[in-house]
From Swiss-Prot:
<feature type="modified residue" description="Phosphoserine">
    <location>
        <position position="378"/>
    </location>
</feature>
<feature type="transmembrane region" description="Helical">
    <location>
        <begin position="491"/>
        <end position="511"/>
    </location>
</feature>
<dbReference type="Pfam" id="PF13873">
    <property type="entry name" value="Myb_DNA-bind_5"/>
</dbReference>
<dbReference type="InterPro" id="IPR006011">
    <property type="entry name" value="Syntaxin_N"/>
</dbReference>
<dbReference type="InterPro" id="IPR000727">
    <property type="entry name" value="T_SNARE_dom"/>
</dbReference>
<dbReference type="GO" id="GO:0006886">
    <property type="term" value="P:intracellular protein transport"/>
</dbReference>
<dbReference type="GO" id="GO:0048278">
    <property type="term" value="P:vesicle docking"/>
</dbReference>
<feature type="domain" description="t-SNARE coiled-coil homology">
    <location>
        <begin position="416"/>
        <end position="478"/>
    </location>
</feature>
<dbReference type="Pfam" id="PF05739">
    <property type="entry name" value="SNARE"/>
</dbReference>
<dbReference type="InterPro" id="IPR010989">
    <property type="entry name" value="SNARE"/>
</dbReference>
<keyword id="KW-0597">Phosphoprotein</keyword>
<dbReference type="InterPro" id="IPR028002">
    <property type="entry name" value="Myb_DNA-bind_5"/>
</dbReference>
<keyword id="KW-0812">Transmembrane</keyword>
<dbReference type="GO" id="GO:0008021">
    <property type="term" value="C:synaptic vesicle"/>
</dbReference>
<feature type="compositionally biased region" description="Gly residues">
    <location>
        <begin position="7"/>
        <end position="19"/>
    </location>
</feature>
<dbReference type="Pfam" id="PF14523">
    <property type="entry name" value="Syntaxin_2"/>
</dbReference>
<keyword id="KW-0472">Membrane</keyword>
Length: 513
């Protein structure tokens, strides 16, 4: 049934004898069209003879219609079905017309949301559960030097991203919530802030609790927070059992420079020994003796060597500070050749260590494809590995899908687990890699700064010696001047005594006569 039949039958679009809207219908024809096309309900509707724009129901003029119900503003107030407009004496129909597209609850005149829930708020992710926090802390603390290292231990952004991706995969494997890398970084930052605040409170409580402070037992760190505290340089308290000692180089007294040289020589020897051990273990990779214990020993040796290199770099910095401080010139001339020799030995050892690390990483990567391919692989290459010119249509595309599905059962769960373990081992090896070039540059900059400090000390000593010579000359002149004054005083004193004696003799002789 069309709207024309409704209008002719005195229904929805019927009109009275004076051209106005009829009370037999709910709304005029134009009103039904407005509702169907624009989702607007209003009463009365302008007559077709009127060319003026009549005001319709809306807020602040919204919902105005031009001739024949044409909208002239972007939006109009939405009213649901069955709601009578204000000021109308006749109820509106509870059902909308069945002709034309319906946009009553979806969009306004221009396709925008017109209902009360126009914008849907972004759903907030749930907080980290204890299991997710434990996995995050264990993984991040394990690769902390690679993720947050600076200076000598700073890694490339791509390598850090791979490590974060691996940590994200481990956290999402728990199945509690779908996280991303940003969530992990924010959670780690919040954990560090909480631990830093607790460490400060514990330190204040150790020095002496204030009268208004709470109990120190309430500030005790949890095991997870203790692991986070170990990533700080030296913020933990000794009473908690997880205090971190600062590098030994920062605790050396300026008078014990020779002890610092001996420590650096021992570190160079340890690095060379680690290089020899790693080369021996490198030959066993890919052989029947390649076991998990061998991989663990490689990882442990590289971690210890990285710590030794960091301690050696701290020793170089400490020696530069000691040489920059007060030091006799004779001792400075004696210690400088020894420092240059140790610096050269350390640079050579670090370069050899970097070469061995690269070899280990390359060989580990080369072993991963061997584990993936194996003996179960079909001689036919899957469709995804074929070149574009080889993907010739032959019958239908289902043939290629069938070939790929035929290849998938060849890879078992054990193979996937082995691949995952090897990938973790490769990632672990890459996390142990150090930027050798950056280390050499840092050592060169340290030595150059040290040379500048030594030169400045020599210049200061020369200036001090020249000033001392000038002071000596001034003192000699002052002594000569003082001697002359003493001589003059002696002369005047002797002359006075002589004159006094003469006067006494004259007086004595005159008295006798």
């Amino acid at each position: 049934m069309s709207y024309g039949s409704i209008a002719r039958g005195g229904g929805l679009g019927s009109r009275g004898p004076f051209g106005g809207p009829s009370r037999q219908g709910c709304q005029p024809l134009e009103c039904a069209r407005c509702w169907t096309e624009y989702g607007i309900r209003h009463f009365p509707c302008p007559s077709p003879e009127s060319k003026l724009q009549n005001r319709c129901v809306g807020k602040d003029g919204e919902g105005d219609l031009g001739p024949a119900g044409t909208p002239i503003v972007p939006r109009a107030r939405k009213r649901g079905p069955g709601v009578a407009p204000e000021g109308s004496r006749m109820p509106e129909p509870t059902s909308s017309p069945t002709i034309g597209p319906r946009k009553d609850s979806a969009a306004g005149p221009h396709g925008r949301m017109a209902g009360p829930s126009t914008t849907r708020a972004k759903k907030r992710k749930p907080n980290f559960c204890p299991q997710e926090t434990e996995v995050l802390v264990s993984k991040v603390s394990k690769h902390h030097q690679l993720l947050f290292g600076t200076g000598l231990l700073k890694a490339e952004p791509t390598r850090r991203y791979r490590v974060w991706s691996r940590i994200l995969q481990a956290v999402n494997a728990l199945g509690y919530c779908r996280r991303d890398v940003v969530d992990l970084k924010h959670k780690w930052r919040d954990l560090r802030a909480v631990v830093r605040r607790k460490l400060g409170d514990l330190r204040k409580a150790a020095h002496g609790p204030s009268p208004g402070s709470g109990k120190p037992q309430a500030l005790a760190l949890t095991p997870v927070e203790q692991v986070v505290a170990k990533t700080f340089s030296c913020q933990a308290l000794p009473s908690e059992g997880f205090s971190l000692e600062p590098p030994r180089a920062t605790q050396v007294d300026p008078c014990n420079l020779q002890e610092l040289f001996q420590e650096m020589s021992a570190n160079v020897f340890r690095i060379n020994s680690s290089v020899t051990s790693l080369e021996r273990s490198l030959q066993s990779l890919g052989t029947p003796s390649d076991t998990q214990e061998l991989r663990d020993s490689l990882h442990t040796a590289q971690q210890e060597t990285n710590k030794t290199i960091a301690a050696s770099a701290s020793s170089v910095k400490q020696m530069a500070e000691l040489l920059r401080s007060s030091c006799p010139q004779e001792r400075l001339q004696q210690e400088r050749p020894q420092l240059d020799r140790l610096k050269t030995q350390l640079s050579d050892a670090i370069q050899c260590y970097g070469v061995v690390q690269k070899k280990i990483a390359e060989k580990s990567r080369a072993l991963l494809p061997m584990a993936q391919r194996g003996s179960k692989q079909s001689p036919q290459a899957p469709f995804a590995e074929l070149a574009d010119d080889e993907k010739v249509f032959n019958g239908s595309d289902n043939m290629w899908q069938g070939q790929e599905q035929a290849l998938l059962p060849d890879i078992t769960e054990e193979d996937l687990e082995a691949i995952r373990l090897r990938e973790e081992a490769i990632l672990q090896m890459e996390s142990n890699l150090l930027d050798v070039n950056q280390i050499i540059k840092d050592l060169a900059s340290m030595v150059s700064e040290q040379g500048e400090a030594v030169d400045s000390i020599e210049a200061s000593l020369e200036a001090a010696s020249s000033h001392a010579e000038a002071a000596r000359q001034l003192l000699a002149g002052a002594s000569r001047h003082q001697l002359q004054r003493h001589k003059i005083k002696c002369c005047f004193l002797s002359a006075g005594v002589t004159a006094l004696l003469v006067i006494i003799i004259i007086i004595a002789t005159s008295v006798r006569k």
